[in-house]
Amino acid sequence: MLFSYDKTLGTVETSQGTMTLTKVFIPFFLEMFLMNFMQTVNTFMLSYFSDNAVAAVGAAGQFSSMIYTFYSVIGTGVSIVLCHHLGAGKKEQTSEAVFSALVFGAALSAVISILMSIFARPCMTLLNIKGDVLDDAAKYFSICMQFSFLPALFVIIFSIFKSYGFPQISVGISLGMNILNAALNYLVIFQPFPFFLKGVSGIAWCSNISRGVALICIIICLFRLPLQLDFHKMRPKSLLKIKEILRVGLPGGISSLSYNVSQTVTTSVIALVGVSAISTKIYVSNLVFYVYVLGLSLGMSTSLLIGWLCGAKKYDQAYKLNLQNLKVTILLNATLSILLFLFGRPLLSLFTKDPDILKVGCALLFWDIFVEIFRGFNHIEENSLRGAGDVVFPMIVSICSCWTMSVLFSYILGVKLGLGLTGCWIAFAMDEAFRGINYFFRWKSKKWMKKTVV
């Protein structure tokens, strides 16, 4: 049967107890849903300030995401290594992995913080934004980058929590952080009383303050949870574990970096259409993320379970779990993206009353139906391959696809053929389809069974 569902496939016995797909999925979903909800609230508030401010913060955020990809290399690597070792019952090597990831992540983020804060404006000029938008984007980016060690440690420590089966910790901390950030943004934008932070720079400082408070909570949890980490036994040679972490994390990081750079280039292409096009993309992206987040949450949950299963050599269960979750994700993505298209105009009207933005935005929501259906393949198949330790193949496919399908055809369809944002969205659908289908057949080939770390 096409939609038969076997709950036992999503159940894994680990040293931390019995883990189920539901137990892992709900915290993943809540964390990303709440984070995006707060981002939507912030965008909603920022739109009252000006559409230019939305464009500036959105452009800087796009570049920031590219920088944060360096940190995801460590987070992804340590997650795969920990899942495989925990699944195999090899606890003694987990402390070395955690210790190495934290030390290397702190050092890397310190270097990036210095470089990016110095070269903030040149980085923003690469996005083809000008005038006040460029000034605000450079200011926002510089302030955020001065404290980029905060998201670096978030990514790494949250990956550690999730690998040990404690994703709910990330949910609570993320919720608190985003509520604090939204409250501070409200004070900055609406100034209900004289507040010392103002404008786009104030928004950037709000982000840093809320992340700083959250980091304190994260560090406390790291040392109070029953992770059985023996940091006092660590020696300089323990840092050699970073080689294993980078070996499995780097291909995924290169893939993510390539994707984020391509998205940055695409944003630059969209900027050629006009500033309103950037604002439209940001408004639409805020809405479609609520479809995106379901598939991504299920994909990340599947990756975690498959990592544990591969560590325990339960390959048949991992294989069937992937195919089952793929069906669920495609069904959910198709249904939700169609509903979003049907109710697109009133939802977009919450952000702007500009008739041109509303017209283009509604058209994009139609094309996004196809994007989300094929994105379902990517979320499940790519994350499953990475969870199994098969990281090189997805990297190659992703790099080839995002630059030929997404970037090249965004320029051809959007600029040369004059289709604007609609052309870019068609290119996005082509990219998702090419990657998703390739990942699917890679999983069916079962070559990933030979890629387990332990």
Describe the role of every protein-language-model region.
Residues 23-42, 143, 177, 210-214, ...:
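Transmembrane helical elements of multi-pass membrane transporters/channels
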Residues 33, 37-55, 124-131, 187-198, ...:
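Helix-terminus/linker motif at the lipid-water interface of multi-pass membrane proteins
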Residues 43, 54-114, 151-170, 267, ...:
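Small-residue-rich hydrophobic transmembrane alpha-helices
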Residues 75, 144-163, 170-181, 203-218, ...:
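Short runs within selected transmembrane alpha-helices of multi-pass transporters and secretion channels
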Residues 116, 159, 185, 189, ...:
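Structural signal for membrane-spanning alpha-helices in multi-pass inner-membrane proteins
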